């Protein structure tokens, strides 16, 4: 890794970065960007502007492939960045090895949000497949968070006594029969549940769940932590060809490295992301509920296998999701 915030020769001209990110990171990167621009200006004298683009992770990846000139991407899952590499050649295939922890500076998991008092008595994944329970989750075709939601439910079903791919598939089919609408991204699903009042339970990123309950409506909503869920690892990457074209490689790389500093890790914890830094994680351990967690590598063999089996055209999701049934 190059030295963090290394001085640049003649780094006085203003620069602009575009961070193309997934749906519920707006608040996180607003604070990260403010901290980084201050640190960078103090170190180099260069003023920078960091612009943000947010949406469903899969949709955002397609926008970059189609020409949105991101200097960096901070998406919901590695498969979306793999697609940018494979389809557009904008960064190397082994991009994930360039930063610590598989290029995931922080993690999250998948939990539930219910209405105050939990009138449907939602306690675990099994409750989401009961008749009469309306579940809000985004579309796995466009949302990275939705894919994590799906895989968390699949892993739970698979790990139950007697669980198999067949029982997990039936479990997911029953779950999606309870989903009345599929938004394109996680923030849209939160709006559907929180503002439009649809659904009994929202499957959500942990950070999005706490944002909704603690900062938007603690008198309206509460978080339910299931017995088991998945370690969600949102990765970050330099988009080499775009950064080189814009002359922003050095500052873009420094920005990504900044995400691993104690300052940025504390900002992540403030916004309910689980810090990867051991010291900051220990300081915020009480802020995050404890539950049994599994990884995508353990259960699905990694993102490439999961994407092909479940979310590519003709995959399991296409077979089980039948609106109107």
Stretches found by the model and what they are:
Residues 1-9:
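Bacterial N-terminal signal peptides that target proteins for export
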Residues 15-143, 285, 292, 318-321:
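N-terminal segment of the mature folded domain
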Residues 20-22, 114-116, 134-161, 175-179, ...:
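Short beta-strand->loop
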Residues 33-42, 65-69, 78, 85-89, ...:
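Sec-exported extracytoplasmic/periplasmic mature domains
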Residues 104-109, 169-176, 182-184, 216-249, ...:
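Periplasmic-binding protein-like
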Residues 117-123, 142, 155-163, 242-250:
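Short helix-loop capping/hinge motifs at secondary-structure junctions, enriched
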Residues 160-227:
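Ligand-binding pocket segment of bilobal, Venus flytrap-like solute-binding proteins
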Residues 243-325:
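Extracellular/periplasmic juxtamembrane helices and adjacent flexible linkers that interface
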